[in-house]
Amino acid sequence: MSANDKQYISYNNVHQLCQVSAERIKNFKPDLIIAIGGGGFIPARILRTFLKEPGVPTIRIFAIILSLYEDLNSVGSEVEEVGVKVSRTQWIDYEQCKLDLVGKNVLIVDEVDDTRTTLHYALSELEKDAAEQAKAKGIDTEKSPEMKTNFGIFVLHDKQKPKKADLPAEMLNDKNRYFAAKTVPDKWYAYPWESTDIVFHTRMAIEQGNDIFIPEQEHKQ
């Protein structure tokens, strides 16, 4: 993928992608959010604002960090390529966080569904963690389906390309479990939190049509 395919995404664009996705995600009724770092952190925080309901406790956000992308050249290079192996850099300490996944609706957030490798790994490992917690409590989720942990996924962009890993078909086919704010061509999407020159980045996003797309008069204060 060449630098000519690079699409700049502004903070405004990210904010509004979360805004337009929130109503659908409310149908999932997430009890907690798990953000995949670093791309999922800011979308998760913005999304939580739009999911907030009066009189209801704020949804907790937890962070995991996985390594998949590796820079193939020197610092400052414009070339980035997908790695082939996922490794944990940071995971949830369930005991310290007093976090119980059993019976919860858990929303996993990342910025992009690219090769799907990272999302597959995160979902698989979190499902294992939930199963272990249920087993430790003596809960059989087959006999008590209300205690099953339900996972959903939200991404800003789903790239239309062959994926290197799978997600469960029942998730992908359920509009209330898999949420992509926008389906996009297979290009290089540069997000604002990766930028070292946000003024240039924002100008490019505006020129490419990747900035504000909801008219101001539709905003709710």
From Swiss-Prot:
This is Hypoxanthine-guanine phosphoribosyltransferase. The keyword DNA-binding does not apply. InterPro entries: PRibTrfase_dom, PRTase-like. GMP binds at residues 85, 110-118, 159, 188-194. The keyword Cytoplasm applies. The modification N-acetylserine is found at residue 2. It comes from Saccharomyces cerevisiae (strain ATCC 204508 / S288c). Dimer. Its main location: cytoplasm. Belongs to the purine/pyrimidine phosphoribosyltransferase family. It catalyses: IMP + diphosphate = hypoxanthine + 5-phospho-alpha-D-ribose 1-diphosphate; GMP + diphosphate = guanine + 5-phospho-alpha-D-ribose 1-diphosphate. GO terms for molecular function: guanine phosphoribosyltransferase activity; hypoxanthine phosphoribosyltransferase activity; metal ion binding; nucleotide binding. Present with 36500 molecules/cell in log phase SD medium. CDD domains: PRTases_typeI (cd06223). Optimum pH is 8.5. The magnesium ions are essentially bound to the substrate and have few direct interactions with the protein. It comes from the Eukaryota. GO terms for cellular component: cytoplasm; nucleus. PANTHER family: HYPOXANTHINE PHOSPHORIBOSYLTRANSFERASE, HYPOXANTHINE-GUANINE PHOSPHORIBOSYLTRANSFERASE. Pfam families: Pribosyltran (PF00156). The gene is HPT1. GO terms for biological process: GMP salvage; hypoxanthine metabolic process; IMP salvage; purine ribonucleoside salvage; XMP salvage. Pathway: Purine metabolism; IMP biosynthesis via salvage pathway; IMP from hypoxanthine: step 1/1. It is an enzyme of class 2 (transferase). Its EC number is 2.4.2.8. Its cofactor is Mg(2+).
